[in-house]
């Protein structure tokens, strides 16, 4: 599993989000995403570590079931309406700082990853960084189909971190209607 430092605080301090793809790892596709969240590090870690909270902001996660010995079974909406089951083993758990995992032998998707929580160098908020490495089902074709359908883990991670930030800072995840459905101010004269 890749544990290399991939950016400095300065690289993610000014923008709210940072994205990098193909950054290493044991599998053919990898990605790192980072976001600054204006909440204490321990609070963010505690919320994430309770895996039952994850479907609150992860659109495609239908359920997370805790199994024995640090294992969890995830049911995820996959491409074409077919659910994918991921069985993960926690490989590292540093309270308040980091959670790392890898797929178990009975997982539908070979994957590994970690999420790290670090105090912002400027004393405000927390840098949350997620690393994902995986082998796409059905190889390159499966990767393309998943990306087009917005079901690719790298694409999903960006949105999930955005929604996590919204939920932790405001208490809700914002949604928006299509522009045609939203009322327009100029229609109310």
Language model features with spans:
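Beta-strand/loop substructures that line and gate deep hydrophobic ligand-binding cavities in soluble
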Residues: 2-17, 23-25, 84, 102-161, ...
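Hydrophobic ligand-binding cavity/cleft-lining segments
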Residues: 2-71, 158, 163, 167-174, ...
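Intrinsic-disorder/low-complexity, polar/charged segments enriched in Ser/Thr/Lys/Arg/Asp/Glu/Gln
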Residues: 30-34, 71, 85, 98, ...
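Short beta-strand micro-motifs enriched in acidic
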Residues: 67, 91-93, 116-120
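Short beta-strand segments that buttress and anchor functional surface loops
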Residues: 72-79, 99-106
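Short, surface-exposed linear segments at secondary-structure transitions and domain or protein termini
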Residues: 93-99
């Amino acid at each position: 599993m890749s544990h290399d430092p991939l950016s400095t605080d300065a690289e993610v301090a000014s923008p709210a989000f940072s994205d990098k793809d193909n950054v290493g790892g044991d599998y053919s596709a990898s990605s790192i995403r980072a976001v600054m969240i204006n909440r204490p590090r321990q609070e963010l870690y505690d919320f994430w570590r309770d895996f039952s909270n994850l479907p609150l902001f992860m659109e495609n996660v239908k359920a997370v079931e805790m199994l024995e010995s640090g294992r969890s079974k995830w049911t995820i909406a996959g491409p074409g309406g077919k659910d994918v089951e991921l069985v993960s083993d926690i490989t590292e758990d540093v309270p308040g700082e980091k959670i790392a995992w890898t797929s178990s032998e009975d997982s539908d998707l070979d994957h590994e990853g970690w999420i790290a929580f670090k105090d912002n160098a400027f004393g405000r908020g927390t840098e949350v960084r997620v690393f994902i490495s995986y082998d796409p089902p059905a190889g390159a074709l499966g990767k393309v189909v998943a990306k087009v359908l917005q079901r690719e883990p790298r694409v999903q991670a960006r949105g999930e971190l955005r929604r996590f930030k919204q939920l932790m800072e405001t208490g809700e995840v914002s949604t928006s209607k299509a522009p045609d459905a939203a009322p327009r101010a100029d229609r109310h004269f």
